Amino acid sequence: MYMSIFDLVHNIPIVTDYPTTELPAQSEPKETFAFIEQELLESLPALQKKESNNGNGLKQGQWTQGACAALLVRLYMNASWWIDEDKTVEAEKYCEKIIDGEYGFYDIDNRWDAPFDWDNDKSNELLFGYPSSFGGMHWLYDYEMFWQVAPFLSSKYFGFTDWGNCNPKYALQPGLDLNGNEYSFENGKPVRKFMKYPDDVRLKKYKNLGNSKREGMFLYGDLPYETANGTEYVTSDNGAYKLYIRDQVGIFRDTD
């Protein structure tokens, strides 16, 4: 929590006593950094190691030594931005400890999406996972992360309409201008960056394969789905035209 607020606001108060009658003053960034570092370093040896070589298992959602070490890595990697000090050596030190198994067995999964899957408690790539249960807080993650990042009627393409239509709010930053030329700025343009590696399996069009399996990570082009009348396509919210997703923003109806 402190690290997230520190990243967002930078000058934050440090509160170690509760209750208190005085409004705490803001702390200098270096003081906040040192406080977070001390908390993590003191907690690390007191936490449990990961015991399984088949994911976090029953420890899913519990802070372990590996997860704590990962927070230290994040802290040190951001030190140059947060306190204008280079902590790369410290970050590498704890990365090596995680890789070498000092805090339990961790490894890169053989599937890129395994750490994000519904059964990620079996993934050795996962350092920490926030637990959830259906009917609990899962709706917040589903709604903000998925239901707001897809076209209005794309639930038909997904093959899952139990929760109604999508409510699009976010989209990837386009990489091409109206004339089809790539923008000259370096940041963003995620699709253009992925296209530099055509063998990357994540570049495939997202498709629900059934049995809790899927492929790809992007939506682009036409979005077909099957009905009793044959193949149909996702349209605009009012059904006026067939939707065709491209790496541009503009009105392209009736164009190539």
Question: Could you tell me what each predicted segment is?
Answer:
Residues M1-G159, D247-D256:
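Structured, solvent-exposed acidic/aromatic patches
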Residues Y106-D256:
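Elongated scaffold/linker segments in the mid-to-C-terminal portions of large proteins
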